[in-house]
């Protein structure tokens, strides 16, 4: 479109008919009113006719400077105006490329290269705002279609890739009905091509997002704040309707069913994008090697296992199981310097056996004399019964003799040979070997160029501890465990000291037989849950007495436990002589049972018995004082009226009611030095028994503690009576 402007240029210097020279400046003298300001669209070509006198043939331009003299500045935009026709009184100028309006440049002024003065009457061109385009129905439908396709590609990417192949296989196995299995198979068909699936949906979504953005920008052309809206509107629509909503829907419980139901749409998309997506997926597969969604780092596996575990123990087992196949024997073994071993020449005496029991090891390596690196055998603690059958431990055989005795046994269940494994062997392979039952113990050998040596040992427990954690046989959280530990330590200490201290007049085996016989004969003590160690406190050293020949022992309100000597017993039925002798040597259980039967059935009473208990009626008084319904069954033979020492000496324990009461209440406890201290009470057990439905026992009452010794007691053991 041509715009005609009427303007008059008058030369400041020069004659009216002469053309402008280089030294003759141009000055604007006036323009027609109402046409001094015009508007043009950005980059819109236009032309106009300029009237005047002595008009120049070139040198016209438009500039954004407020003065023509400043048009040479770098920050100023200048556009040259071309002279199409030039005459003496007018000229036709054109701007074929239009004026480049932008945010910072919205006004251009017409200037001439020889002009030095600018006035407001000079030609001014303003930017013209384009009219907003009318929305067409086809453009709106096309935008809706683009958003729908982009949303489908974005959501279905998550819908198909949400489950791994492991999850889909599990779902296929547990699915109920053919319809559910059919949906899983449809998902698995595309899930196996996960790389191509990701590339296809990404390409499809990107294409339709670009088409939507371009169409939306055309629809917003010419509106107010056009530049801002062209960026904000497409971005918000794509974010909300093409990303957030479809991904949220496909991530929910509906995503799986949608992906399985719209499988035919996915097939069409695969076919359309196949020429580009398939080669691109091959390139990605070439570099990634494996499924882009199936590869899990060790950290991801650890986090997954932690989320699956319900407690710390399960988490430890799962974490150890994932790394177990990478473990070597050398990482799980016990170094040879920390191993408890026996020398082949070492004797199996009392101290050694008690040390083995105290250590608690089930398998003891045996080395060759002083060289701990040469393992010649293994002593299994469970074979000690077989060892006692073959050898006599009282003779203190050496470890070599014990192993030789085990070797002579024909029973092949005795395994004393040692297996050797390489330090670089995989731990799971060794575990598979040990699970066969051939061996549960092995020596770890490290091989060098010219030599080899034993550097440690490994057991099946060491390997299992790596899987399930440390096997702690002592649970410190349970009170019962601490009680058992104290009891075990007390028994071991008792075994070490018995027979080696002057205050222990009997060997350990004889003491144990006395206590066992006491608990076997006195049933009321069992009702109080009195065990061996508590019975040992009752039969303490300060209660041992010695009677001389022809002495009549006091029987009134006393319980006598005679363990050595010969006595003459008189009861309501008969008078007989009884020999008491606790065997010092090991005897079989058959001999013990025969002696017990002879004690109760032999009328001649000539067979020695290990223990003779006199004064059982005192036990019934004890139970009555404690308020217990339990009592000792008594017969006429239990009421002894007279007891005379026949042998030169007779050793016995003398117990009064107060002694029994104090021991049961825990008021007195005798240590190894004979000192009395506070012990543990057993009345809680009695109270729990008395609260049963069959019990008619009144409320338990605890008598006051009474000193177990009095001034008129007989002379203690090893002292002569007056």
Curated annotation (Swiss-Prot):
Ranges in the topological domain labelled Cytoplasmic: 161-196, 249-257
Main location: membrane
Subcellular location per the Swiss-Prot or TrEMBL entry: Cell membrane
GO cellular component, one term: plasma membrane
Disulfide bonds: none
Coiled coil stretches, renumbered: none
Disrupted-gene phenotype: No visible phenotype. Quintuple knockout with cnnm-1, cnnm-2, cnnm-3 and cnnm-4 results in a reduced lifespan and 100% sterility.
Membrane spanning residue stretches: 140-160, 197-217, 228-248, 258-278
Positions of glycan attachment: 102, 114, 320, 349, 371, 639
Extracellular side: 18-139, 218-227, 279-722
GO MF terms, alphabetically ordered: transmembrane transporter activity
CNNM transmembrane domain residues: 132-318
Membrane topology: Multi-pass membrane protein
GO biological process, one term: magnesium ion homeostasis
Compositional bias segments (type: Low complexity): 688-703
Residues annotated as domain CBS: 333-396, 413-473
Signal peptide (UniProt feature, chain positions): 1-17
Keywords: CBS domain, Cell membrane, Glycoprotein, Ion transport, Membrane, Repeat, Signal, Transmembrane, Transmembrane helix, Transport
Region of interest called Disordered, as start-end residue ranges on this chain: 584-607, 686-722
Function of the molecule: Probable metal transporter. Probably acts redundantly with the other metal transport proteins cnnm-1, cnnm-2, cnnm-3 and cnnm-4 to regulate Mg(2+) homeostasis.
Family indicated by similarity: Belongs to the ACDP family.
Protein name as catalogued: Metal transporter cnnm-5
Species name: Caenorhabditis elegans
């Amino acid at each position: 479109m041509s715009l005609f402007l009427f303007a008059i240029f008058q030369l400041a210097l020069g004659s009216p008919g002469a053309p402008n020279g280089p030294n003759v400046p141009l000055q604007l003298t006036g323009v027609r009113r109402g046409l001094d300001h015009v508007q043009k669209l950005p980059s819109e070509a236009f032309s106009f006719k300029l009237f005047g006198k002595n008009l120049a043939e070139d040198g016209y331009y438009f500039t954004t400077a407020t003065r023509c003299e400043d048009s040479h500045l770098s920050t100023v935009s200048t556009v040259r105006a071309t002279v199409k026709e030039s005459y003496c009184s007018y000229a036709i100028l054109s701007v074929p490329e239009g004026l480049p309006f932008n945010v910072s440049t919205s006004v251009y002024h017409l200037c001439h290269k020889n002009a030095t003065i600018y006035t407001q009457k000079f030609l001014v061109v303003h930017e013209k705002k384009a009219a907003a385009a009318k929305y067409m129905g086809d453009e709106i439908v096309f935008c809706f279609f683009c958003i729908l396709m982009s949303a489908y590609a974005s959501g279905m990417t998550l819908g198909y890739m949400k489950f791994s192949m492991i999850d889909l296989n599990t779902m296929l196995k547990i699915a109920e009905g053919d319809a559910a299995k059919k949906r899983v198979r449809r998902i698995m068909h595309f899930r196996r091509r996960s790389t191509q699936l990701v590339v296809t949906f990404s390409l499809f979504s990107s294409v339709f997002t670009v088409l939507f953005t371009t169409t939306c920008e055309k629809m917003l052309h010419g509106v107010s704040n056009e530049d801002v809206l062209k960026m904000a509107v497409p971005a918000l629509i794509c974010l909300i309707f093409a990303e957030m909503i479809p991904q949220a829907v496909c991530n929910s419980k509906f995503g799986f069913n949608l992906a399985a139901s719209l499988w035919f749409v996915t097939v069409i998309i695969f076919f359309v994008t196949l020429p580009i997506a398939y080669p691109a997926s091959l390139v990605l597969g070439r570099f990634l090697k494996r499924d882009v969604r199936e590869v899990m780092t060790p950290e991801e596996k650890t986090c997954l296992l932690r989320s699956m575990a319900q407690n710390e123990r399960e988490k430890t087992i799962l974490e150890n199981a994932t790394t177990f196949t990478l473990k070597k024997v050398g990482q799980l073994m016990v170094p040879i310097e920390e191993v408890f071993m026996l020398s082949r020449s070492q004797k199996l005496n009392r101290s050694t056996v008690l040390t083995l029991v105290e250590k608690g090891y089930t398998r003891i390596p045996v080395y060759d004399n002083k060289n701990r690196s040469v393992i010649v055998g293994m002593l299994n603690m469970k074979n000690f019964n077989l060892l006692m059958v073959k050898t006599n431990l009282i003779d203190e055989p050496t470890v070599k003799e014990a192993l030789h005795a085990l070797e002579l046994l024909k029973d092949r269940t005795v395994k004393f040979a040692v297996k050797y494994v390489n330090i670089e062997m995989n731990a799971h392979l060794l575990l598979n070997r040990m699970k066969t039952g051939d061996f549960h113990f092995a020596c770890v050998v490290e091989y060098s160029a010219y030599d080899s040596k034993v550097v440690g040992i490994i057991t099946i427990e060491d390997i299992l501890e790596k899987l399930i954690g440390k096997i702690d046989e002592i649970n410190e959280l349970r009170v019962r465990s601490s009680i058992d530990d104290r009891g075990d330590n007390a028994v071991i200490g008792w075994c070490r000291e018995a027979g080696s201290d002057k205050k222990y007049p009997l060997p350990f085996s004889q003491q144990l037989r006395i206590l066992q016989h006491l608990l076997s004969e006195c049933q009321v003590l069992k009702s109080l849950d009195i065990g061996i160690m508590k019975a040992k406190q009752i039969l303490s050293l300060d209660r041992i007495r010695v009677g001389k020949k022809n002495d009549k022992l006091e029987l009134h309100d006393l319980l006598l436990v005679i363990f050595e000597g010969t006595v003459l017993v008189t009861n309501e039925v008969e008078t007989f002589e009884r020999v008491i002798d606790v065997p010092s040597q090991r005897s079989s259980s058959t001999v013990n049972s025969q002696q017990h039967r002879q004690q109760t059935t032999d009328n001649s009473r000539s067979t020695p018995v290990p223990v003779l208990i006199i004064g059982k009626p005192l036990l019934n008084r004890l139970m009555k004082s404690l308020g217990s319904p339990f009592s000792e069954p008594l017969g006429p033979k239990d009421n002894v009226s007279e007891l005379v020492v026949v042998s030169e000496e007779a050793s016995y324990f003398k117990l009064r009611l107060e002694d029994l009461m104090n021991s049961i209440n825990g008021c007195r406890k005798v240590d190894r030095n004979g000192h009395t201290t506070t012990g543990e009470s057993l009345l809680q057990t009695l109270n729990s028994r008395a609260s049963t439905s069959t019990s008619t026992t009144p409320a338990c009452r605890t008598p006051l503690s009474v000193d177990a010794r009095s001034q008129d007691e007989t002379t203690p053991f090893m002292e002569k009576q007056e």
